[in-house]
Amino acid sequence: MKSFYTLLLASMVSLSVSAQNVDADKVRTAQNKALRDSLSKATEVLAYHPDSIDLRLKKAAWNIQLEQWQYAKDDLDKVLFLNNTNIAGLFYRAFVNEKLLRYNFARLDYQNLLVLVPGNFQAQLGLALLNEKDKHYTEAYDGINSLIEQYPDSAMAYAAR
């Protein structure tokens, strides 16, 4: 009898987890549809305002959320062509280049960002993690140790170590 209840409980838990997975898939599908709708509207508006940096940054953000890395990179390249000191453009292009496995380009973007905003926590952390991913261990550990010295109360800096 005990095994019957155990089996019944296990099947109920399994059904509950399956229902949660189905609900999560429906939510994700709805979110992706909304992002694609926003992306298509932004593309239409960009036809009339091709030099709008804000709109291109939003479009790149939607492409990043949809994991369309190359489209995001193209928009970020245009943003940085229009304004080569755009901090958001440099940071997000570094992230996208990392996703595209273009580590040297990502490293350059992080370094250029740190020239514009020395000591930026996110840029230093991104560069250190990129160096670790690209097997530049000495630079990675130096960067993480520098972060810990600058931000001794940051749990993220310690977690990166």
Q: Residues of each region from the PLM?
A:
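Bacterial Sec-dependent N-terminal signal peptides
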Residues: 1-25
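Helix-start (N-cap) detector for alpha-helical repeat units in TPR-like alpha-solenoids
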Residues: 53-54, 87-88, 121-122, 155-156
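N-terminal leader/linker segments that initiate helical-solenoid repeat arrays
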Residues: 19-77, 81
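Alpha-helical adaptor scaffolds
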Residues: 122, 126-133, 156
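Structural signature of tandem alpha-helical TPR/SEL1-like repeats
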Residues: 31-40, 66-78, 99-112, 134-146
